[in-house]
Design a protein with these regions (language model features):
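Active-site-proximal cap/loop segments of hydrolase catalytic domains
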Residues: 66-194
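Cap/lid segment of the alpha/beta-hydrolase catalytic domain
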Residues: 1-117, 152
Length: 194
């Protein structure tokens, strides 16, 4: 197996690190791609070993982990550029990393699946809404997709502590409007079957 870190350029010019893992004897052009992200709480996402990934890698899937803003991959300032009123950088970075890898010929949108859980599930909902053309599928594990409704209720056990990460939309109209502009539930496209 091979691992390589590459750098891609986000729409605002920031350079985003992306870790790639693939099976050494499998060509990396037009592969199926499994791209996963988190981008919150200053937590770094690294392509650590997991036996469950071996089957996927053995089938020729390229495993990609972009270190998007909001995570801790590049230090405190990196985190600060991806939380509160900068949260959209996380989503844009993930989409831009996906597109850069696809433009490089590593995968096509028809063979790209995105994955994230919890806050990464919010990431998945946002990127599915913002750039559905980039992904054949999106897997959101325990997603935080109705973030605005949840974070408006201070009686919920985690709400007040979550204000440090997302902002306090209950008492700040700017935070409310910003969260409403990206939360997956608030921005889900209308069904064509209505």
């Amino acid at each position: 197996y091979m691992e390589r870190r590459v750098w891609v350029t986000a729409r605002d010019g920031e350079r985003i690190p992306v870790s790639l893992v693939w099976r050494r004897d499998v060509p990396t052009c037009d592969s199926a791609m499994f791209i996963t992200g988190y981008g919150a709480y200053e937590i770094s996402s690294d392509p650590g070993f997991a036996v469950s990934r071996i089957s996927m890698l053995d089938r020729g899937v390229l495993y990609a982990v972009p270190g998007i803003r909001g995570g801790g991959e590049m230090g405190r300032a990196w985190y600060e550029q991806g939380h509160l009123l900068n949260k959209k950088h996380s989503f844009e970075d993930f989409i831009d990393a996906t597109r850069a890898l696809q433009r490089a010929g590593l995968a096509s949108p028809l063979r790209t699946v995105a994955n994230g859980g919890s806050a990464g599930g919010l990431l998945m909902g946002a990127v599915a809404n913002m750039a559905p053309e980039c992904y054949a599928g999106v897997e959101a594990d325990v997603p935080f997709v109705d973030a605005l409704t949840s974070i408006l209720d201070p009686s919920l056990p985690l709400t007040v502590t979550e204000w440090d990460e997302w902002g306090d939309p209950l008492h700040d109209a700017d935070v409310y409007a910003y969260m409403k502009s990206y939360t997956p539930y608030e921005n889900a496209p209308d069904s064509e079957n209505d």
